[in-house]
Amino acid sequence: MEAEGLGWLLVPLHQLVSWVAAGAMVFGGVVPYIPQYRDIRRTQNADGFSTHVCLVLLVANILRILFWFGRHFESPLLWQSIVMILTMLLMLKLCTEVRVANELNIKRRSFAATDSKDEELRVPPRRPYLDFDPHHFWHWSSFSDYVQCVLAFTGVAGYITYLSIDSALFVETLGFLAVLTEAMLGVPQLYRNYCHRSTEGMSLKMVLMWTSGDTFKTAYFLLNGAPLQFSVCGLLQVMVDLVILGQAYAFAHHPQKPAAHAVHPASTKAL
């Protein structure tokens, strides 16, 4: 009798746990970027954050949404992609504003045009939409250029997906590319740390959140029977996170000696 009396609690409790897990999947991925965003705004310095992290996440989540049209997966994963895209656009907007404000003699770099002379001297000439300098790709001076690039990529990828949606091979390949790209999330930051032989400007708190979040996400994929691509993605991300944590430990105990003439920028701990 007592077991039967408690039975009515079990189903609601199970549903509650499912809702909490789904909510954590949707919004948990953006939590690590909150300290990064706040620190960049506080210090007005974005040097410690690689905007290529935003590029990786934008591409990965756009591809994941397109993959959903060919092979439906759980709704929380779809909403997670939408929330992440909006978050990365906010990060790009802040980083662009801060970088431009900190550059005294800035040359305009845009998605639709190559470098021009200083804007104070003359207005840059109109150029074809895709006539951009590859050396300055993803280092533009206007947030609108990033938006144009994202929209162009979404349009092209969406059109190709529309034409090939009936091909199972294409759909599975699309899913693999989405998760493989996302698995490379930490690589731009890892490479930046390696080149500078330092993790200054990178928030250890954020990387720890990355690691815990990716571990939870991978477990969620495995327990809920998500497509194999998602589980592979999660495992690769956890490994990259651990390497970045190793960098933080190594560079903290064996810091690079600064050059005599070097001037360190203000710290921007926030990845």
From Swiss-Prot:
Localization annotation: Membrane
Domain of life of the source: Eukaryota
Modified residues (Phosphoserine): S110
Protein name (database record): Solute carrier family 66 member 2
Keyword flag tRNA processing: no
Entry annotated with the keyword Membrane: yes
Pfam families: PQ-loop (PF04193)
Keywords: Membrane, Phosphoprotein, Repeat, Transmembrane, Transmembrane helix
PQ-loop domain mapped to chain residues: 14-80, 178-233
Origin species: Mus musculus (Mouse)
Membrane protein topology class: Multi-pass membrane protein
Residues spanning the membrane: 7-27, 49-69, 72-92, 145-165, 168-188, 232-252
Entry GO terms, CC: membrane
Main location, first listed in the record: membrane
